[in-house]
Amino acid sequence: MEMTTTQRLILANQYKLMGLLDPANAKTYARSEAIVRGGFSLELKALDNEFNNLSVEECQTVLDTLEMYKALQVSYNNLTDKAEVTEHRLKFAGYCAVREKKYLNYLRFITGTEGKYQEFMHCEHGCDSQTPMWDKYTKMLDVWRNCPHGYHLSIQEIQKILNA
């Protein structure tokens, strides 16, 4: 993270103020303030990672994934014979908090702050899948997009999407 001296001073002061406003996290803010004031490049890079930017395409893929899971749920609920797919397989796992943190943060923003997709967001561990899921969801989306009726899926189409 490249910053001018003035920018570092402003950011350091912001961290100091946050520590005063949020005593429960004062140590974290004090550490960040020390890093910024000191200009410690290695630690600044780690701080910069807290501000991962998502491209429009990445945001859209997360939204499309949520929409796909909504379609899977709606389609499953409309089926008369549900024996071939368990409801557990239709649960959205989320994203890996370690390797896919930026996607998980966006997911939490969409579902928490924006309040969208609440009807089926019952993931365990705060939607931390504890394993990378991006590639799996991308493959599932490819299959879903090729289905002629995205929200009226047959049991075979549901299975094909889940098995992608």
UniProtKB/Swiss-Prot annotation:
Domain of life: Bacteria
Originating species: Actinobacillus succinogenes (strain ATCC 55618 / DSM 22257 / CCUG 43843 / 130Z)
NCBIfam families xref list: PRK05445.1
Family: Belongs to the UPF0304 family.
InterPro entries membership: UPF0304_YfbU, YfbU_alpha-helical_sf, YfbU_helix-hairpin_sf
HAMAP family: UPF0304
Pfam families: YfbU (PF03887)
Database matches in Gene3D superfamilies: Helix hairpin bin (1.10.287.680), yfbu gene product, domain 2 (1.10.3190.10)
Protein name as catalogued: UPF0304 protein Asuc_0543
